[in-house]
Design a protein with these regions (language model features):
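A cross-kingdom marker of C-terminal helix-rich interaction/assembly modules
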Residues: 1-160
């Protein structure tokens, strides 16, 4: 699920930078460099020493919030908040340990779930998966339409 959030952030950053390129805020060389870093960036300098450094994942996440702000007027960072909560669940040093437990508000008691008892995962907003899937598709389709309208595509199959 984190990969879905991060990939949605990546397509949102590509969308944002494409708009900046079309508005001539970025040169074609700057835009090309951003795309290179976005698609080929890695921290693996042992096997890929000449590869560009990747974008920090939070820059990608923030690009998704930028899209929400521009398109829908959101004033908070909903996407980042969802990603932060999801990240907290996956870390072995904190909240992730307590996924199968309930903690009292005063933090003094932990109630463990029984072996056969289902834990109410909806408490952790897994509906974010549905939202993020839809959100990714929305950004992708809008970006693709912009590219098809504004760019000369070399192959007919890319146009349909």
């Amino acid at each position: 699920m984190r990969a879905l959030f991060e990939t949605t952030g990546a397509i949102a950053l590509a969308h944002k930078k494409y708009i900046q390129f079309k508005e001539q805020v970025l040169t074609s060389e700057e835009f090309d460099s951003i795309l290179l870093k976005l698609y080929l960036g890695t921290k693996d300098k042992i096997n890929l020493p000449d590869s560009p450094d990747p974008f920090n994942v939070m820059k990608l996440i923030d690009a998704a919030d930028h899209f929400l702000k521009k398109k829908y007027g959101y004033t908070d960072t909903k996407f980042r908040k969802g990603y932060d909560q999801l990240s907290e669940l996956t870390h072995p040093n904190s909240f992730g340990y307590f996924l199968g437990h309930k903690i009292s508000k005063d933090l003094k008691n932990i109630q463990f779930t029984d072996d056969n008892e289902e834990f109410p995962l909806t408490d952790y907003e897994l509906e974010a998966f549905t939202f993020t899937t839809h959100f990714y598709k929305e950004i992708f389709i809008e970006l693709r339409e912009l590219v098809v309208q504004n760019e000369e595509l070399p192959f007919a199959e890319f146009k349909s």
